[in-house]
Regions:
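Conserved beta-alpha-beta core of the PfkB/ribokinase-like small-molecule kinase fold
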Residues: 69-152, 168-170
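A non-catalytic, amphipathic alpha-helix used as a structural packing/dimerization or gating element
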Residues: 3, 88, 122, 126, ...
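Conserved phosphate-binding/catalytic region of the ribokinase-like
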Residues: 91-92, 142-242
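Short, hinge-like loop/turn segments at secondary-structure boundaries
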Residues: 5-10, 34-37, 116-120, 147-150, ...
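Structured loop/turn residues at beta-strand edges in well-structured enzyme cores
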Residues: 62-65, 125, 156
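Conserved N-terminal subdomain of the carbohydrate kinase-like
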Residues: 1-74, 99
């Protein structure tokens, strides 16, 4: 964990609540690059990844409760004790505004799709924003069509549903508003990290009080900028670039 802490500080990220698990290695991920749309990932997380070994005792529950924004990935629901830790965090959060679930479904981390659907379904009433692509929405709510998927997420309890559609752009819906945003056209070098940039821009837009349209435009553009670059975390755009 030493490298992770050092890199976070170098990038200006507050790491005071980042827990290390001495018994486990920092996971390593390799990405092959076959532009424009094939970027297979190879994860080295055996025997287990430290993020999946988090317990509720590791969590700064007051900080989670009081945070202006709180983001989880559903990968954390794939295994105990991380699953229970996530439920503890969401319980402390108590559906405070900007409680976000990234529907980031990675089959290799789950027993099967049915298990993933069951566990993701349990947390949707506890979050206010859900973000995923069509495949991830299908796992979460059984709907692949963007309109029906967004509606199903809203029916499950979220206040803002965002469905990423790749080259077809992004659909975002609340109970009173609908935004369709075309993809920002770039020459793709590496798609790895585009989703992270998209999510980061969503967080920035929500915290800045931007309109839904401006927020989704910024997110789409941020993802496109990163996909036009070779790197990932160090390729994230700044607000002036957007």
């Amino acid at each position: 964990g030493r490298f992770v802490h050092t890199e976070m500080r170098r990038l200006g990220v507050d790491d005071r609540h980042v827990v290390t698990k001495a018994a486990y290695n920092t996971p390593v991920t390799f990405c092959e690059i076959f532009p424009p749309d094939d970027f297979p990932l190879y994860f080295y997380r055996e025997p287990s990844a430290p993020d999946l070994e988090l317990t509720w005792e590791d969590l700064p529950l007051e900080a989670i409760r009081d945070a202006s924004i709180f983001w989880i990935s559903v990968t954390g629901l794939s295994k105990e004790p991380s699953r229970s830790a996530h439920h503890a965090a969401l319980g402390a959060r108590d559906r405070r505004r900007f409680t976000i679930a990234d529907l980031d479904y990675r089959p290799m981390f789950w027993k099967d799709e049915e298990t993933a659907h069951r566990e993701v379904s349990k947390i949707l009433p506890k979050v206010t924003v859900a973000i995923g692509n069509r495949e991830e929405c299908e796992v979460a709510v059984g709907e692949r069509d963007p309109e029906r998927a967004a509606d199903a997420l809203l029916e499950a309890g979220v206040e803002l549903a965002i469905v990423k559609q790749g080259r077809e752009g992004t659909l975002a819906k609340t109970r009173t508003e609908r935004v369709e945003m075309p993809v920002t056209s770039v020459t793709t070098k590496n798609g790895l990290g585009a989703g992270d940039a998209f999510g980061g821009a969503i967080c920035h837009g929500l915290l800045s009080g931007w309109s839904l349209e401006k927020t989704i435009f910024a997110a789409s553009t941020a993802g496109a900028i990163v996909s036009s670059r070779l790197e990932c975390s160090t390729a994230m755009p700044t607000e002036p670039e957007l």
